Amino acid sequence: MSGTDKVRVNVSQTAQTPLHTSAKLPKVGVLLVNLGTPDGTSYGPMRRYLAEFLSDRRVIEWSRLIWYPILYGIVLNTRPRRSGRLYDRIWNHENNESPLRTYTRAQGEKLAKALSDQPNVVVDWAMRYGQPSIESITDRLLQQGCERIVIFPLYPQYSATTTATVNDKFFEALMKKRFMPAIRTVPSYEAEPVYIDALARSVEKHLATLSFKPEVILTSYHGIPKSYSDKGDPYRQQCLETTRLLRERLGLGEDEMRATFQSRFGPEEWLQPYTDETVKELAKNGVKLVAVLNPGFVADCLETVDEIGNEAAEEFLENGGENFSHIPCLNDSEEGMKVIETLVRRELLGWV
């Protein structure tokens, strides 16, 4: 056999050998990230959590010369105790953690099970503020051999204050690494059919358990300062789009489902209408039956369970309302997990 023939045989054999077998596929990490949680409800853990959260320039855009004296001189000396008392009302005392951590862990575990048909996929979860941190979980994914990572900021509607800061922190963690994996980030999904359908099903299921039919359903989103929206943050428009699509899916009129914004902080004007003022106004105007859901939260937390389920309910009932119900977030429900799995599988295309 000539040298040329030998080359031909070798090339032919190589062409028939796949570049990767299933055992040799590079590992792909999937990192779910939510906002964050304190480690406890006492002063120390609350102060550490609030300091990290309120020091984020994406969250508070004021000059540090103005903001830091307020933050460290006033806010962090007064707010930790108040916030701790609020967290204590919703705390998962059995696991000694906030509901957000409980649900996010469950979402990660259920997603890993759903993706078990992809043996090279590693699923994990983290928090933007608090523990487990994005940096620590990114380290863990890299240590497990992940050469590609899909990061999923768990926010259906994009805002620089949420989605962008998750991506910031993730890439900040990678800045310290010699090896940087290939990255994909899941975009906002405010109009995704699977998401709208999941919201609609959750509303329908919850309403079927009530002894009353709400006259008005509010879709309450976490607010942001109006100035952020004026500068180009698309958050408000995406929230309104979600509500419009959900309203159409449920066959409701504009007066039957309205978008509002909650959780304002500080002296600035935030996106309006405000949820707390709206429930009070509805009650004073003779509306007796109200339900509220939080489409922008993928898991129940302080802002949904307490701020809506307790505080908004009290406002409504104290001003003449008769029945108020908070519709739970999608959490780790079958509908909620279908949304997460669908979007993750889309981003995994070509990688698994």
UniProtKB/Swiss-Prot annotation:
GO terms, biological process: heme biosynthetic process
Catalytic activity: heme b + 2 H(+) = protoporphyrin IX + Fe(2+)
Enzyme superclass (EC): lyase
Descriptive protein name: Ferrochelatase
Binding site for Fe cation: 222, 303
Pathway(s) served: Porphyrin-containing compound metabolism; protoheme biosynthesis; protoheme from protoporphyrin-IX: step 1/1
GO molecular function: ferrochelatase activity; metal ion binding
Database matches in Pfam families: Ferrochelatase
EC number: 4.98.1.1
A GO CC annotation given for this chain: cytoplasm
Cited function: Catalyzes the ferrous insertion into protoporphyrin IX.
Keywords: Cytoplasm, Heme biosynthesis, Iron, Lyase, Metal-binding, Porphyrin biosynthesis
Keyword Nucleotidyltransferase: no
Coiled-coil region(s): none
Similarity comment: family membership: Belongs to the ferrochelatase family.
Localization, UniProt: Cytoplasm
